[in-house]
Swiss-Prot record:
Residue ranges of the TM segments: 5-25
Recorded superkingdom: Eukaryota
Alphabetical list of InterPro entries matching this protein: PSII_Ycf12_core-subunit
Description of how the protein assembles with itself and partners: PSII is composed of 1 copy each of membrane proteins PsbA, PsbB, PsbC, PsbD, PsbE, PsbF, PsbH, PsbI, PsbJ, PsbK, PsbL, PsbM, PsbT, PsbX, PsbY, PsbZ, Psb30/Ycf12, peripheral proteins of the oxygen-evolving complex and a large number of cofactors. It forms dimeric complexes.
GO cellular-component term (any): chloroplast thylakoid membrane
Keyword field contains Phosphoprotein: no
GO biological process, one term: photosynthesis
Membrane topology label: Single-pass membrane protein
Full protein name: Photosystem II reaction center protein Psb30
Role: A core subunit of photosystem II (PSII), probably helps stabilize the reaction center.
Length: 33
């Protein structure tokens, strides 16, 4: 695998994982308030 392809895959996975995580964090913070 090329480094470019690997980098793109890692960035894609990070975005896919961080999306729901950010939403969950916001929901938890709103619930605490």
């Amino acid at each position: 695998m090329n480094l470019e392809v690997l980098a793109q895959l890692t960035v894609l996975t990070l975005i896919v994982i961080s999306g729901p995580l950010v939403i969950a964090l916001l929901a938890v913070r709103k619930g605490n308030l």
